[in-house]
């Protein structure tokens, strides 16, 4: 995961740690395709026929390559009145707290990806529940989706990307140590819904 300003983005290129926030935002927003993935020839950006925006077009085979937003999927795991958070073992935001989440992989649904990330980062056994938040991080081309999840037991076994995994009551949440805006907003919405006694699905734009 990385952060651009106060926004949240997952798994930036390795060189990102050396970039300014503005440079990093440009790098992630436009992942320039230099060569055609189909044939290896040079790709150039222009507006193809019957389109309305620039695409990477192969100069040899004519293949048009699309660059689309990335899905980040995670959970809000709950045990009783407590919520599970993981403390990051990797840069950036090393040592800060986050909900278990990461890139969706090919061949899985958003819920399957969120479950996988929860197991990988926290070693938690959960039952997946409804989709809770959909947060569009427009500036960096990502969509973050968090599901509510009921923990089946209190066993935790953090993976290599987590220093530790811990359960927090609402008044114990380390708000000033949360890694990403999407995590903070999701937690705020979760506790608001819990106080009302009903959970919805929330959508918002960030950046």
Where are these regions (language model features)?
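Conserved acetyl-CoA binding element of GNAT-fold acetyltransferases
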Residues: 97-102
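NUDIX/MutT-family hydrolases
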Residues: 158-189
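Short, functionally important structural connectors and interaction interfaces within domains
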Residues: 89-91, 96, 130, 148, ...
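N-terminal leader/linker segments that precede catalytic domains of diphosphate-processing enzymes
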Residues: 2-92, 103-120, 124-155, 196-207
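A short, amphipathic alpha-helical segment
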Residues: 188-196
């Amino acid at each position: 995961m990385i952060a651009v300003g106060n926004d949240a983005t997952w798994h930036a290129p390795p060189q990102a740690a050396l970039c300014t926030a503005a440079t990093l935002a440009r790098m992630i927003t436009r992942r320039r395709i230099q060569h055609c993935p189909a044939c290896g020839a040079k790709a150039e950006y222009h507006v193809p026929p019957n389109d309305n925006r620039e695409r990477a077009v192969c100069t040899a085979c004519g293949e048009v390559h699309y660059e689309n937003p990335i899905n980040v999927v995670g959970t809000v795991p709950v045990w009783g009145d407590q919520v599970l958070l993981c403390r990051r073992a990797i840069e950036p935001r090393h040592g800060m707290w986050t909900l278990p989440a990461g890139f969706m992989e090919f061949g899985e649904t958003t819920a399957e990806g969120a479950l996988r990330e929860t197991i990988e980062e926290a070693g938690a056994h959960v039952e997946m529940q409804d989709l809770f938040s959909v947060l569009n991080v427009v500036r960096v081309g990502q969509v973050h989706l968090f599901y509510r999840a009921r923990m089946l037991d209190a066993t935790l076994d953090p993976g290599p990307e987590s220093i530790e995994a811990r359960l927090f009551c609402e008044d114990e949440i380390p708000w000033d140590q949360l890694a990403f805006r999407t995590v903070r907003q999701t937690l705020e919405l979760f506790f608001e819904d819990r106080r009302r006694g009903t959970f919805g699905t929330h959508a918002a734009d960030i950046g």
